[in-house]
Design a protein with these regions (language model features):
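Conserved phosphate-donor/acceptor-positioning beta-strand/loop module used by diverse small-molecule
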Residues: 103-108, 117-133
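Post-Walker A alpha-helix
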Residues: 26-27
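Post-Walker A helix-loop "phosphate-sensing" segment adjacent to the P-loop in P-loop NTPases
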Residues: 32-40
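P-loop (Walker A) phosphate-binding loop of NTP-binding proteins
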Residues: 16-18
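Extreme N-terminal, non-catalytic leader segments
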Residues: 1-13
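ATP-dependent small-molecule kinase phosphotransfer cores
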Residues: 42-103, 109-113
Length: 133
């Protein structure tokens, strides 16, 4: 009988913290140091801003499309911020991990807690802002 080897899974790396803590700066440094690390592109219902590219900056959807995806359990995490939804597409991230690629998520703490419930074997890093007087 031929022996098969299971491909090693990638790692889900979740960087979270409050706004202004430096998540983006840290994630940019991680991506520069590890160029093979896949960045998870979020989905949103807000309008694209100048220079944003579908599938690179965000996946842009209508409220109706996003709510249908919520019903289909299509997100690792999601939240409604003011009048717009934001979320991390589950299938895309988990497919990359299954293919042996490591994935970086930059999200807020509430999102990280949702991801931890759905994918507890991820690596979770919480960024604490510097104390200022």
């Amino acid at each position: 009988m031929a022996q098969t080897t299971k491909k090693d899974e990638g790692i889900l790396l979740v960087v979270s913290g409050p706004s202004g803590a430096g998540k983006g700066t840290i994630c940019n440094a991680i991506r520069e140091k590890f160029p093979d690390l896949q960045y998870s592109v979020s989905m949103t219902t807000r309008d694209p801003r100048k220079g944003e590219v579908e599938g690179e900056s965000y996946f842009f959807r209508t409220n109706e499309q996003f709510e249908k995806l919520i019903e289909e359990d299509a997100f690792l995490e999601y939240a409604k911020v003011y009048d717009h939804y934001y979320g991390t597409p589950k299938k895309r991230a988990l497919d990359m991990i299954s293919d042996g690629k490591s994935v970086l998520l930059e999200i807020d703490i509430q999102g990280a807690m949702q991801v931890k419930k759905r994918y507890p074997k991820g690596v979770f890093i919480y960024i604490v802002p510097r104390y200022r007087l």
